[in-house]
Amino acid sequence: MNQLDALKQYTTVVADTGDFKQLAQFQPQDATTNPSLILKAVQKPEYAPLLKDCVTRWHGRAIDELMDRLIVRFGCEILSIIPGRVSTEVDARLSFDTAATVARAERIVELYQAEGLHIDRVLIKIAATWEGIQAARQLEQRGIHTNLTLLFSFAQAVACGQAKVQLISPFVGRIYDWYKKQAGANWDEAAMAGANDPGVQSVRAIYNHYKHFGIGTEVMGASFRNTGQIVALAGCDLLTIAPELLAQLAASDAPVARVLDPEAARRVALQPVQYDEAGFRYALNADAMATEKLAEGIRAFAADAAKLEQLMQAAA
C-alpha cells in the first residue's frame, strides 16, 4: 500500500489546487482553492478560456462580481470531480470587515446555488482575523459553513472553536518557514523534522485541544513543505495537500502510522482556554510568528486577487 492510500485510512485527504484536471488521479474527498491558486491556473492555456468566458458572459458587471463568478466556476468544475466539498475564498482585502465578508460569502453561496449545488458542499474560506472569525460565526448561524484560513496560532484556533466554525486550516509549512528563517545557519533540518517540526507541533496542540474539550470544529492541516510533515499528522481530521506532494505520497511505500487520535487527546491533561476580543488581540500580538505570517498571508492573497482582477479587465 502506498503512503497516500495508507494516509486515507486515518485522515480525509484534500487536494489543494485550482488545477482541477489533476484531481481525478488522486481521488481526494475534498478540495481547497485560494486566489493564488486560481491566478496560477488561469495563466495556463487550458484554463484561460474559463476566465474569458466569464468576462464575456457577464460583461458589464462589477469586477468584484466577476471575480466571484470566476472562483465559483472553478469550484463547480472541482465539485463535478470530487464527492465532497470545495473551499472557496472571500476576497482577502475584506479580512478586517465583518459585514463585507458576510455579504461576499452570501453572494458566493448564492452563485453556487444558482448552479444547482447544495451549500453543504461549499466551505467559505475566510482569514482568521478577529473580524473574519466573527463573520464566520454569523455565517455558521445562517447555515453557511466556513473554513478559517491563514491560521498560525493557538489563539486563532481557540477563537474559531468558540465561534463554532466548521473547519480551520492551520498552516504547517509557513510556520516551519518562519522558524527556519529565524534560526538561519543554526537550523538543523533532521533534528527539527517530524514531531519536532514547529508547524507539526502547532497542529497537534490544536487537534488535542479540540478533541479533549469536545469542540466540533474540524482541523485540516495545510501548507506543507514535505511529505514528512504530512505523515507526522496522520490521523488529523483532514489534510489539504498540493498535487506535487500527493504524487510523492502515491509513489512511496514507506509505512504510515496513525499519530493523532481523539481518544489519546482526551487523556492529555489540558486546561480550558477562552478569549474575548481584547484577549485574542493581545495573544496574537504576543506571537511574533503568527502576527507576521497572518499579515504576510493577507497581503499575498490580496495582491493575487488584484492581479486576477487585472487579467479579467484585460480580457474584457
From Swiss-Prot:
GO CC annotation: cytoplasm
Pathway linked to the protein: Carbohydrate degradation; pentose phosphate pathway; D-glyceraldehyde 3-phosphate and beta-D-fructose 6-phosphate from D-ribose 5-phosphate and D-xylulose 5-phosphate (non-oxidative stage): step 2/3
Protein origin, superkingdom: Bacteria
InterPro entries, per database record: Aldolase_TIM, TAL/FSA, Transaldolase_1, Transaldolase_AS
An annotated GO BP: carbohydrate metabolic process
Record-annotated active site: K125
Family to which this protein belongs: Belongs to the transaldolase family. Type 1 subfamily.
Protein known as: Transaldolase
